[in-house]
């Protein structure tokens, strides 16, 4: 009987999705009020264990600039998570890498609105290049390719 109980406990644990086992990661996402892909990105984050507070704003360029994201590297929206800026449709795996490594940067960005990225429609045409940004004006450097 004890063996059956242990087996049932193990199987029940495996049935729980992994994001549900971890504490949710709180994020604040600033987006253009008319943008629907940003809502898709927020839903993607929620499905992957984030709690997302979506804030419509008509001042995204300034929010990104204040966070250290150069104008030519801006993504579709700007998010803040655990002291970092995450600009654009950055995949969750790269955000988790950022939070685990805790590098001395302002954050990361996936410039533009690449097709096939989380929250965007279409198929992924090529790997996404995510850049690290700083507030000191240094040129962005490749942080991850996914």
Q: Model segments located where?
A:
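Residue-level detector of anion-binding/catalytic polar loops
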Residues: 51
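Cleavable N-terminal signal peptides
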Residues: 8-10, 20
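Bacterial N-terminal signal peptides that target proteins for export
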Residues: 1-8
